[in-house]
Curated annotation (Swiss-Prot):
It is a multi-pass membrane protein. It is found in: Membrane. PANTHER family: PLASTIDIC GLUCOSE TRANSPORTER 4 (PTHR48022), SUGAR TRANSPORTER, PUTATIVE (AFU_ORTHOLOGUE AFUA_3G12170)-RELATED (PTHR48022:SF80). The gene is criB. MFS-type transporter; part of the gene cluster that mediates the biosynthesis of echinulin family alkaloid. GO terms for molecular function: carbohydrate:proton symporter activity. It comes from Aspergillus cristatus (Chinese Fuzhuan brick tea-fermentation fungus). Coiled coil: none annotated. It comes from the Eukaryota. This is MFS-type transporter criB. The lineage of its organism: Eukaryota, Fungi, Dikarya, Ascomycota, Pezizomycotina. Gene3D superfamilies: MFS general substrate transporter like domains. GO terms for cellular component: membrane. The chain crosses the membrane at residues 5-27, 46-66, 83-103, 106-126, 141-161, 168-188, 256-276, 293-313, 323-343, 355-375, 402-422. Pfam families: Sugar_tr.
Length: 463
């Protein structure tokens, strides 16, 4: 019991992170497999769609899970997400045309998005304060392990000269979903959710089981009382806990902004672009075919090892400073990487330097932004809105929504053109000058009137 139980729960629930890492990573190698390319013959735009559509499903999965997690409890919400992961994996593995593959990716994305929202909240709510960073950080560790296994699975299957080359890796997506579904039966429910639903005796029992040893039972009871009082106070302050209410209350709005901001800044580091198109990056550096897939496997393994080591220190570190230092370090590596890839001809040393920068970037990410983003975003919301707030914040972690950035910029551009830009079609250059209120410009009508007047005076003088 105690710490061993907390760690076990963190790891079992963290299988959702494994799913996220595997499902994201497996397409990195799959889109480079010869048999996959022969089967679907995708154009470059379709490759992007196959990769990104999982994130579209994840967006809606995140939003849906917030409400379900409040209604059903964290455990049942986890099981709900697993069902979609298993069904989606089966559809992808059995796909014989692009539409079926896309539907499978969408369904899997919905399940992964649901789990991405629910599990970190669950991990944060069952963790003693001292160990919260480590327990929630298990999500990133499992994600890194899943990504590494996906890369090595793709590399191993690349030696098979049949559709098994890509069907088997996609089918394996369902396995961790099945394991997590049945493993959820053995997870204790979140004590905070139990208190929220007036199951006080059950909540106290869970808190006592989760504390490190019997000598801390008094501390466990004290934390239980703190949970009860906090939730009672939250209920008294605001009976309504809808999504709309989160935007109405200033304090909740700030938490949502900070939670979403963490995920937005994480994506703006560039990590997801590098991860999804890793084999293409290696190809551009001169490592093609199976060599690129092999390097992807090494890349994933380095990430898993780095994250594992980081978990021993994450509960002792502050949150903000490591993230800021990581941004500065990643900036430097990206500048060097850009310089190397911009070179018209890369020698052996240039190729190795580019690969080294990609690996260094990933090590920095896995030791800072990787684990700390999950921790910070899951712990800043109060119990009353934790699932809903985190669901909206984590929806920002679904990369497809960056298309909305271009939706917004296109719409704003249309408004700017409508209200600020004058029409120039069919006008002389001098008339266009007048549109900008240039007082030195003489309007054509004025010129014409003066010309008519001079002509008239000239005619009259002759007569």
């Amino acid at each position: 019991m105690g710490l061993s139980l907390v760690l076990s729960c963190g790891v079992i629930a963290g299988i959702s992170g494994f799913l996220f890492g595997y499902d994201s990573g497996i397409m990195t190698t799959t889109i480079a497999q010869e048999q996959f390319l022969q089967q679907f013959k995708p154009k470059e735009s379709m490759v992007g769609t196959i990769v990104a559509i999982m994130q579209a499903g994840g967006f809606f999965g995140c939003l849906t899970a917030g409400k379900l997690s409040d209604l059903w409890g964290r455990r049942k919400a986890i099981m709900f997400g697993c069902v979609f992961v298993v069904v989606g994996g089966a559809l992808q593995a059995a796909a014989y045309h692009t539409a079926m593959l896309l539907i499978g990716r969408l369904v899997t994305g919905f399940g992964v998005g649901s789990l991405t929202m629910t599990v970190p909240v669950y991990q944060a709510e069952i963790s003693p304060p001292r160990w919260r960073g480590t327990i929630v950080g298990c999500q990133q560790l499992m994600l890194a392990i899943g990504s590494a296994i996906a890369n090595w699975t793709g590399y191993g299957c690349s030696f098979v000269n049949s559709s098994f080359q890509w069907r088997m890796p996609l089918a394996l997506q369902a396995v961790p979903g099945i394991v997590l579904f049945f493993g959820s039966y053995f997870l204790p429910e979140s004590p905070r959710w139990l208190v929220e639903h007036d199951a006080l005796d059950a909540a106290l029992h869970v808190v006592q089981r989760l504390y490190p040893d019997k000598q801390n039972l008094d501390s466990a009871y004290a934390e239980f009382q703190e949970i009860v009082e906090q939730i009672k106070q939250e209920k008294a302050q605001a009976s309504e806990r809808s999504y709309l209410q989160i935007f109405r209350r200033k304090a909740w709005r700030k938490r949502l902004f900070l939670g979403a901001g963490i995920w937005l800044m994480l994506n703006l580091t560039g990590i997801n672009v590098i991860n999804y198109y890793l084999t293409q990056f290696f190809t551009s550096l001169g490592y093609k075919g199976r060599r690129a897939i092999f390097l992807s496997g090494v890349y994933g393994s380095v990430g898993a090892a780095t994250t594992f080591l980081a978990l021993f220190f994450v509960h002792r570190l502050s949150r903000k400073t490591p993230l800021m230092m990581a941004n500065i370090s990643q900036t430097a590596t990206l500048i060097v990487m850009a310089g190397l890839t911009a070179a018209s001809e890369l020698g052996k040393s240039g190729q190795m330097g580019g690969v080294a920068m990609i690996f260094l970037f990933f090590v920095i990410y896995c030791s800072t932004w990787g684990p700390l983003s999950w921790v910070y975003a899951s712990e800043i919301f109060p119990t009353q809105i934790r699932s809903k707030g985190y669901s909206m914040a984590s929806a920002v972690n679904c990369e497809w929504r960056f298309y909305f950035l271009f939706v917004a910029t296109n719409f704003i551009s249309a408004l700017v053109l409508l209200f600020l830009y004058p029409e120039t079609s069919g006008k002389s250059l001098e008339a266009i000058d007048l549109l900008f209120d240039d007082h030195q410009t003489i309007h054509r009508s004025t010129l014409e009137e003066n010309e008519v007047r001079r002509t008239s005076e000239s005619v009259n003088a002759k007569h």
